[in-house]
A protein has these predicted regions:
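Short catalytic helix/loop segments, enriched in acidic residues and glycine
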Residues: 1-12
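Phosphate-coordination/substrate-recognition cap region in phosphate-metabolizing enzymes
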Residues: 11-79
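Glycine-rich phosphate-binding loop signature in dinucleotide/nucleotide-binding domains
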Residues: 18-21, 110-118
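Short beta-strand scaffold positions
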Residues: 27-28, 101, 122-123
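Acidic, low-complexity terminal tails and accessory targeting/binding regions
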Residues: 57-69, 112-117, 133-182
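Short glycine/proline- and acidic residue-enriched helix-loop micro-motifs
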Residues: 76-98
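A glycine-rich beta-strand to alpha-helix segment
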Residues: 114-128
Length: 182
């Protein structure tokens, strides 16, 4: 469930993107994404296609814990979570090969259906990092360099021979919410 802050961030995201035209809108089936997407989809008068494979990685025994709790309970530096997942060090977590394959399948679907068009994907930080890893042909563990805030925007332009990050981790709620902004 989103917190009150999360609902406010979702409304600011909707305000920022209001009036934009997207040829395709996809979203994860998970509750927090559905709640984040609602104000935006309502403002656009649109529905999103739900792609089950866009759900967040299964963190196994880490699921439901805050980062500081993971450090205390499991004795690992949660800042290195991508490395731990990629190495298979997290009990009961989704295997990295399966996660990569799942996200690759959803990416291929979205690229096929939205080739040359504006596509909006509403998903999770781990999914965004895996999409970046696949598009940039980099190991997932290196994606810890990319911060992904809640309700933030990452804009990627993909052409047949090149992927370019146009905007990353832009948080409209920082500009429209507490800070006043436009």
């Amino acid at each position: 469930e989103l917190s009150g802050t999360g609902h406010g961030q979702a409304k600011d995201l909707a305000k920022f993107l209001k009036g934009r035209n997207f040829d395709h809108i996809y979203r994860s089936p998970m509750v927090r994404v559905r709640q984040t997407a609602k104000p935006l989809l309502d403002s656009l008068g649109r529905e999103a296609e739900v792609i089950d494979e866009l759900r967040e990685v299964d963190f196994g025994v880490w699921t439901g814990h805050k980062w500081h709790e993971i450090q205390e309970k499991f004795g690992v530096d949660a800042a290195d979570w991508l490395v731990h997942l990629e190495n298979g060090d997290v009990a009961e977590a989704e295997p990295m090969d399966g996660y990569r394959s799942r996200i690759r399948g959803s990416l291929e679907q979205m690229m096929s259906e939205g080739e040359g068009q504006d596509v909006l994907v509403l998903c999770h930080g781990g999914v965004i990092r895996m999409l970046l890893a696949l598009l940039l042909e980099e190991p997932f563990s290196k994606m810890d360099r990319f911060e992904v805030d809640f309700a933030s925007l990452t804009v990627i332009e993909h052409r047949s021979n090149r992927t370019e990050i146009k905007l990353h981790n832009f948080a409209p709620w920082l500009w429209l919410g507490e800070n006043g902004g436009a």
